[in-house]
Amino acid sequence: MEREGLSGFELLVVVIVGIGLALVGAVWAGASLALAVAGDEPRLPFSAAADAAIRLPANLSTPAEAWAEPYAEALPGVFLYWCSTALAATAILGVSAFVIRWVNRSKVGTAKRRPLGVDGRTKYAKRRDLAPLLVSGPTSGRFVIARFGRHLVATESPPPRTQGRVGWLARRSRRSDRGAVALFGPSRSGKTTAAVAGVLEWDGPAVLSSVKADLLATTQGWRSTLGEVRVYDPTSSTTPKRASAMWSPLQQAGTVVGAQRAARALCDAAPRGGVEGGMDFWLAQAEILLSGLLFVAHNAHRDMDAVCEWVLTQDRPGELGPGEVRAALDSLNLSNSAAVGRGAVEVAKGLVSVWEMEERTRSSIYATAQTVIWPWTDPGVAASARAPKAKKGRRRSFVGLDLPWLLSGSNTVYLCSPIEDQRRLAPAFGGLLNDLINQAYRHVAATGKPLDPPLLVVIDEAGNTPLRSLPEYASTLAGLGVLLVTIWQSLAQLEVAYGKAADTILTNHLTKVFYAGLSDSASIQYVDRVLGEAEVDTRSHSAAERTNGGSDQFSTTRLPLAPAHVLRQMRPGDALLVHGTLPPAHVRTRPFYRSPHLANRAATDLTQEGTRA
């Protein structure tokens, strides 16, 4: 559309006249209101108000004298006069603001619409939009992510379970529920620093996995003041030798079901090397083999050293004899424990099925199992899984990493390994993480209640910690009372690690934070699709006829709400928050070293009570 534009002088005249009319109107309306309140009939001409407005500054203490007779005599006292004038001026200002906004509104673009009950025009969130996420300070059970203005941004807490009719405000509320958090950002973008700040303000139990020493060094001291701290670091990358906490897949392998769960936890964490589909078959077969071997090792009072030997040598009945595993099975069949005897019969079926397969197939199954148990050929990992024996050859229980100990207080488990060992030892670290999470599933199934207080699980460099069950974890852990926080270098890293399952993982992370510096196409395209395009007013000026002053042409164009260059060029410390059904928000990270109370917590020395592993 086209309309004639106002020159600068014309615009100045309009502004001056408008201000003058508003002032005279306030004087006239205030005096008329004062007369009405005093009980007199207001009959003040507008021209008299214009004359009074000129003399009013000189008669502030006696405003009636600014008016000509006979109006001056009828006006009430100074208090009522000025109160009425202030009220009238406020009303006129409000009306003027509404008119100005209405006149200046965009007269082009699409009409306002609300498809599916949502504003069809995309925009960034304001404070009221983020109400479900904003807290004034650290809140129990909620993980602080960032800062929005003077408020902190934290994960949501589960809504109260109330009976009866839901009120109007509750129906209109965008409040959701606790959900997983995903942080995306290149190296040195502040994502781990933001996670450290959240951990320092978390007051419940926690499992913290990282390939860098930053997370351990800055949070271990403070966490040790809240509860016991145990560090699983079999390579001694962050702890002295033989100081690592102990954990073995054999801990729960005393029953057939326990052995199957232990084997599944290990195979879920095994590296796949980019193989899709076909690798799942071999891992499933290796899981059958390992479940039997773990059961035999546990009940025969052997350790993971023996399991490694059985897999690497393909121990089985042959021409040279029955083999060690077959002999142990026969011994367990004669056990005084009926449960052990029945279990031996069950696992024997799976083992025999593997042993009797064609040579090439059997070798492939053992080769796959070797990649799963390979970490326990490392002396440090083997030592951390080797429980000392008590008298008469009985196995002494681990001072161990299990869920009951973790939930007994605000206790913490750290999983630490250098980046160069992360993939090599993935089944050990991923197996422990899977074991703890699976225990949470069983605990909630047995009690019928989510964990309270909730358990925090932080996986730094999640792309280097492969977990086949991560899609299920992202979608179900929140309902169990487990808050999952995963940290990635980019969305492309997630897609490389999980392939087609990446979309499922991303969707089920309720909260997603994108930090400054992202430049991979996967992240840019995702943000562009999710945020959509905003309508932007454009104006072009035509000055073909100098005497006419030209004309302005107004239209709208559609631009991405967060263009690629904006996502990359954000200030360090800025981030884009995408949460559930809320509009996207521009937030700031909270470096722990810039907050005095967080810096003091990060500098806390490790207590003696917290060092016990």
Give, region by region, the residue ranges found by the protein language model.
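Basic- and hydrophobic-enriched, low-structure N-terminal and domain-boundary segments
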Residues: 1-20, 28-189, 193-197, 532-533, ...
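P-loop NTPase motor domains
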Residues: 25-26, 30, 34-35, 182-482, ...
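P-loop NTPase motor core of the ASCE superfamily
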Residues: 89-90, 281-284, 410, 472-475, ...
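Short alpha-helical interface patches
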Residues: 96, 108-141, 255-267, 313, ...
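Structural motif
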Residues: 173, 449-450, 504
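Short hydrophobic alpha-helical runs that function as membrane-insertion/retention elements
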Residues: 205-209, 229-233, 483-489, 512-516, ...
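Histidine- and/or cysteine-centered catalytic micro-motif in compact active-site loops
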Residues: 418, 462, 489-491, 517-518
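Sensor-1/coupling segment of RecA-like P-loop NTPase cores
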Residues: 477-496
